[in-house]
């Protein structure tokens, strides 16, 4: 099938899913339970996935429409980096350490008796003694975060690795593992948060900027809402214009969605390439890679 036919197949499936999963008119979260942090599909799961697909298709106005449906529904709330969920974790960090969040639209449900792959294995390889990661965060990515951006402490922690060179580096702890699973000696296993509210804000912000009649004010407002939930303090507003808007949004997607599987799609959509820094290893073949835009 062509790419066009493949996308149409997806949109048709989403149309049917929206019909089957439509909420009842009298749906009430007080009596029927919340929709956030769900392992089940519902009408807004479909809207969120459709917004992502429409972004990839560059159908900006429709992406705005469906992201707005999710954002304005009132069923999901950005997890705060400043409000404490426990004595040791903010609500945002708790999303990654305990797999519970008011902004998760849909997650893959795991139990200690039935769980998927260890997402964090390659970033830590902890053996109860040392950490020997296969991959470490790139300096340019870590340096994107501002001083008062509290995502840093949720995503990264400096360790001295167990390798002979004794590298000390900020390692990715975003997927270090659900603490409940760790209690059963199940390491680096986390429930994938496939759809989150923060992504919907980023989808809408990008679509506002890329559409035929850009609205930089609304795009800046969406970035401000997200940063307010992520920073220790974020005063004022995010000023976007034709010259800086996409740079800001591109960086914000890296900072918020780091290592969640979006990067390649983003680079393709933005017509940007990348270059891998040559690695110090025994095999030179594949050690470096450059992909042009």
List each model region and its residues.
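Structured, solvent-exposed acidic/aromatic patches
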Residues: 1-198, 210-217, 242-244, 292
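Long, intrinsically disordered, low-complexity segments
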Residues: 9, 118-119, 239-293
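Active/binding-pocket-proximal capping segment
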Residues: 201, 216-232
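Active-site-proximal region of nucleotide-activated glycan assembly enzymes
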Residues: 205
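Active-site/pore-lining binding-face segments in mid-to-C-terminal subdomains
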Residues: 209, 228, 246
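Cytochrome P450 fold signature focused on the C-terminal beta-domain
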Residues: 232-239
């Amino acid at each position: 099938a062509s790419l066009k036919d493949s996308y149409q197949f997806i949109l048709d499936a989403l149309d049917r899913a929206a019909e089957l999963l439509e909420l009842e008119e009298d749906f009430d979260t007080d009596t029927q339970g919340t929709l956030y942090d769900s392992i089940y599909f519902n009408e807004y799961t479909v809207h969120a996935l459709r917004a992502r697909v429409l972004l990839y298709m560059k159908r900006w106005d429709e992406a705005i429409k469906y992201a707005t449906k999710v954002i304005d529904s009132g069923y999901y709330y950005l997890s705060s980096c400043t409000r404490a969920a426990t004595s040791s974790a903010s609500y945002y960090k708790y999303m990654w350490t305990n797999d519970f969040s008011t902004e998760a639209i849909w997650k893959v449900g795991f139990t200690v008796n039935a769980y998927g792959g260890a997402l964090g294995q390659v970033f830590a390889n902890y053996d109860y003694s040392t950490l020997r990661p296969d991959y470490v965060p790139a300096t340019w990515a870590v340096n994107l975060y501002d001083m008062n951006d509290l995502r840093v402490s949720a995503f990264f922690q400096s360790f001295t690795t167990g390798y002979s060179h004794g590298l000390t580096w900020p390692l990715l702890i975003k997927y270090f593992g659900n603490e409940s699973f760790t209690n059963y000696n199940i390491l680096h296993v986390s429930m994938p948060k496939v759809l989150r509210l923060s992504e919907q804000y980023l989808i809408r912000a990008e679509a506002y900027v890329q559409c035929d009649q850009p609205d930089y004010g609304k795009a800046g407002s969406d970035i401000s809402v997200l940063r307010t939930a992520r920073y220790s303090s974020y005063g004022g507003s995010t000023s976007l214009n034709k010259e800086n808007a996409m740079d800001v949004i591109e960086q914000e997607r890296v900072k918020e969605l780091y290592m969640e599987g979006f990067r390649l799609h983003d680079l393709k959509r933005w017509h940007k390439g990348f270059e891998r820094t040559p690695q110090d290893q025994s095999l030179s073949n594949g050690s470096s890679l450059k992909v042009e835009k």
